[in-house]
């Protein structure tokens, strides 16, 4: 074969390889962002863990140097270094057999809260979960509302779950979360906000809709924004309102139980009603996967709030494996995030319009809504 033909053939094969590689990359970045971001978050989390380990090692070395200096001088060194905030001694949980009266406010650290849970990811029908929960506690009422009767609930908490086509996940979430909240003696209600129509998934706008609908039912103290595929592993991860804004899902199994980055606010988070109104809720402009949690973090910081997180192993969650393709990537999120502060007063609870279809189910209130961009108009930014 002549040399110039061999060269053309190799060039063609090279171009074909580059085309295949680029189209595959675009598919994973745009159509299957969860796979790409899962590995990206793991790399970021590893970096944070390495920096934290180096910091702690440095503190330990410093302590040894200081102790040695005191020893040489023949004096005692009494100060104790605190290498990590998780080393601090927590308030103990109440002992078994502790009794409280119905007119007393429920304690926050009850003996019924056992700690690590046995997570069962096997699929189960929703009506089977309903039977199990009603058998365990008949006090669970329509709409997923419950309150304790052996003490006065300290907090009234609305759980908002954004939803589309995850019918196999809801029963698993309820099977674990409802009994945990009952053991925490919280008054709670579940709101599943289901997006209808063909627009890309808008998790943030669904949360805004859910907030407005939940506030029509009851004067809740706080709201928790809860992804349907996040299963808590420890019932001592208290869902009360006292330390909000709060990021609950600190350590997720698919990120190797590490925080992807310091500003990460996704999965499960919560704010008081007053805080959420003050920051104008979530942004409505994030269509598709990614960015809305980072924008919420920015809004919280702009308002001067400090986010708290559960210590140690309390913030562990497992993610239900997905058997279908996730939502498409929102490629415009970085542009919006750069203008978070300017957009905060324009885009959120105050510019949202919608027409919901509300139905009361046994374990939750379902809010079905068709979303479109003209439901939350905002000037060009």
From Swiss-Prot:
It catalyses: a beta-D-glucosyl-(1<->1')-N-acylsphing-4-enine + UDP-alpha-D-galactose = a beta-D-Gal-(1->4)-beta-D-Glc-(1<->1)-Cer(d18:1(4E)) + UDP + H(+). It comes from the Eukaryota. GO terms for biological process: carbohydrate metabolic process; dorsal/ventral axis specification; ganglioside biosynthetic process via lactosylceramide; glycoprotein biosynthetic process; glycosylation; otolith development; positive regulation of BMP signaling pathway; protein glycosylation. SUPFAM superfamilies: Nucleotide-diphospho-sugar transferases (SSF53448). One of its GO terms (cellular component) is Golgi apparatus. N-acetyl-D-glucosamine binds at residues 291-294, 333. GO terms for molecular function: metal ion binding; UDP-galactose:glucosylceramide beta-1,4-galactosyltransferase activity. Glycans are attached at residues 73, 82, 120, 366. Its main location: Golgi. Residues 1-11 are cytoplasmic. Its cofactor is Mn(2+). UDP-alpha-D-galactose binds at residues 162-166, 201-203, 228-229, 257, 289, 322-323. Mn(2+) binds at residues 229, 322. Gene3D superfamilies: Spore Coat Polysaccharide Biosynthesis Protein SpsA, Chain A (3.90.550.10). It is an enzyme of class 2 (transferase). It is found in: Golgi apparatus, Golgi stack membrane; Golgi apparatus. Residues 33-381 are lumenal. Pathway: Protein modification; protein glycosylation; Sphingolipid metabolism. The keyword Metal-binding applies. Disulfide bonds join 106-151, 222-241. It is a single-pass type II membrane protein. Keywords: Disulfide bond, Glycoprotein, Glycosyltransferase, Golgi apparatus, Lipid biosynthesis, Lipid metabolism, Manganese, Membrane, Metal-binding, Signal-anchor, Sphingolipid metabolism, Transferase, Transmembrane, Transmembrane helix. It holds the Pfam family Glyco_transf_7C. Belongs to the glycosyltransferase 7 family. PANTHER family: BETA-1,4-GALACTOSYLTRANSFERASE, BETA-1,4-GALACTOSYLTRANSFERASE 5. This is Beta-1,4-galactosyltransferase 5. The lineage of its organism: Eukaryota, Metazoa, Chordata, Craniata, Vertebrata.
């Amino acid at each position: 074969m002549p040399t110039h033909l061999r060269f053309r053939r190799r060039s063609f094969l090279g171009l074909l390889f580059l085309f295949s590689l680029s189209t595959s990359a675009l598919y994973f970045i745009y159509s299957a962002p969860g796979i790409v971001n899962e590995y990206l978050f793991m790399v970021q989390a590893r970096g944070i863990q390495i920096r934290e380990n180096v910091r702690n090692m440095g503190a330990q070395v410093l302590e040894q140097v200081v102790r040695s200096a005191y020893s040489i001088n023949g004096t005692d060194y009494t100060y104790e270094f605190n290498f990590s905030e998780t080393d601090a001694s927590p308030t103990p949980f109440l002992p078994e057999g502790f009794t409280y009266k119905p007119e007393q406010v429920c304690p926050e650290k009850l003996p019924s809260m056992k700690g690590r849970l046995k997570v069962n990811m096997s699929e189960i029908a929703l009506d089977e979960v309903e039977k199990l929960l009603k058998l365990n506690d008949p006090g669970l009422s329509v709409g997923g509302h419950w309150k304790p009767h052996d003490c006065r609930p300290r907090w009234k908490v609305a759980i908002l779950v954004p939803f589309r086509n995850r019918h196999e996940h809801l029963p698993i979430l309820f099977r674990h979360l409802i009994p945990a909240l009952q053991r925490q003696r919280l008054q709670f209600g579940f709101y599943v906000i289901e997006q209808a129509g063909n627009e890309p998934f808008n998790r943030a706008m669904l949360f805004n809709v859910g907030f407005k609908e939940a506030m029509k039912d009851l004067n809740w103290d706080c709201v928790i924004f809860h992804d349907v595929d996040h299963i808590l592993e420890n019932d001592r991860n208290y869902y009360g309102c006292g330390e909000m804004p709060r990021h609950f899902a600190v350590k997720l199994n698919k990120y190797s139980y590490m925080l992807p980055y310091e500003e990460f606010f996704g999965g499960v988070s919560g704010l008081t009603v007053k805080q959420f109104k003050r920051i104008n809720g979530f942004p409505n402009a994030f269509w598709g996967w990614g960015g809305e949690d980072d924008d919420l973090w920015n809004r919280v910081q702009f308002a001067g709030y400090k986010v708290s997180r559960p210590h140690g192993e309390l913030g562990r969650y497992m993610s239900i494996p997905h058997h279908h393709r996730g939502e498409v990537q929102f490629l415009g999120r970085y542009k919006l995030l750069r203008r978070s502060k300017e957009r905060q007063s324009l885009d959120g609870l105050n510019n949202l319009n919608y027409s919901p279809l509300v139905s009361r189910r046994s374990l939750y209130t379902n809010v079905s809504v068709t979303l479109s961009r003209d439901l939350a108009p905002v000037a060009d930014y």
